[in-house]
A protein has these predicted regions:
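Flexible "arm" and connector segments at domain edges
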Residues: 1-109
Length: 109
């Protein structure tokens, strides 16, 4: 599935207050789901000596899907095309790599 199709299908399942004019809801959802990814990774470190078994990976995969859903809906709320966001990110990283500036901090490296 491509990003355009995903964004359309994700939007079909969106149900939250002020749909179409509410960028706060998907932003908060994104942060919450990213926290759930981090929590699952933390538990692998704590409970499984850092070994990611199939069960752990599947749980993380589900949470990553939720992260993607919220990213997609936030893009829609902001009138961004998810595919354009992904391509712009890769172009930025390629430019940084060409300049030898992948490491470091700041948006304008």
């Amino acid at each position: 599935m491509d990003f355009k199709t995903y964004q359309i299908k994700a939007r079909e399942t969106a149900q939250y207050p002020d749909l179409g004019s509410n960028n706060i809801y998907p932003t908060l959802g994104l942060v919450g789901e990213a926290g759930e990814v981090a929590e699952k990774v933390k538990k692998v470190i704590r409970d499984k000596n850092g070994i990611f078994d199939n069960e752990s990976k599947l749980g993380i995969k589900k949470e990553l899907g939720d992260v993607l859903w919220y990213i997609s809906n936030l893009c829609t709320e902001l009138n961004f095309n998810l595919e354009d966001v992904a391509l712009q990110n890769l172009e930025k990283l390629k430019s940084r790599a060409a300049k030898g500036k992948i490491s470091g901090s700041g948006d304008d490296r």
